[in-house]
Amino acid sequence: MSFNNPDHQLDAIGLRCPEPVMMVRAAIRKMNDGETLLIIADDPSTTRDIPSFCTFMDHTLVAKDAEQAPYRYVVKKGL
């Protein structure tokens, strides 16, 4: 899976912790199992928070580009 053709997209540019993760959680609640969410963020804490959220909430971190901002993540709802 790459960053192309996600089912949903979330722009969290300019938001700071804890807002990005709260928005991810709200977006994923509305999704069906197996759908993907592309997250674009510039808060450095997301490099830690998004992977931790996936582990804790049993979602799959499909792709991650966190070398420099803007950071990009693709999360699949469910495992």
Curated annotation (Swiss-Prot):
InterPro entries: Sulphur_carrier_TusA (IPR022931), TusA-like (IPR001455), TusA-like_sf (IPR036868). Its main location: cytoplasm. Signal peptide: none annotated. It holds the Pfam family TusA. It comes from the Bacteria. One of its GO terms (biological process) is tRNA wobble position uridine thiolation. GO terms for cellular component: cytoplasm. The active site is at residue 17. Keywords: Cytoplasm. One of its GO terms (molecular function) is sulfur carrier activity. It is found in: Cytoplasm. Gene3D superfamilies: TusA-like domain (3.30.110.40). Sulfur carrier protein which probably makes part of a sulfur-relay system. Belongs to the sulfur carrier protein TusA family. This is Sulfur carrier protein TusA. It comes from Pseudoalteromonas translucida (strain TAC 125). The gene is tusA.
